[in-house]
Amino acid sequence: IHRRKVACQACHAQAVKQCYGCHVGTDAKGIAYFKCQKTTLGFKIGRNPSPTPDRPYTYDVKRHPPVIPGTFDFYSPAAIKQFGQSPTWKACAPHTIQRHTTQNSACNNCHGNRDLFLDISDLADDEVAANAAVVVADDQLPSTLAHDALPPN
């Protein structure tokens, strides 16, 4: 339906695990560990900041890598010196592809659905500048459609 405007995964992927705030360190006994501040199940549709002939889409699926400033300080203080210089929400191709999904069962499951699209409110304060190119502003959301039927398969 959307051809080169929307990546196939936006309509055909199911939710994937999103991790936030990964920390690496050692416990009191010196045993290495990592932990995340939180995890959620879902995904967001965001803008494609760098279209290519192979990925010409305006919109694609984004996932949140768990890295934050300080993640690797256990190994080397300030190991991520350039955090915030590129988007932290990355394009992904989840292994949850299905022909029929919640979002492709009706047009308005995506059109006009703010929750499905990456919003500035989804970002941590230190991610806002880096993700400006992938956030979908309100005026970029696909409008709710008067008809809500998909063409027959």
Annotate each predicted stretch with a short phrase.
Residues 1-153:
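C-type cytochrome heme-c attachment and multiheme electron-transfer modules
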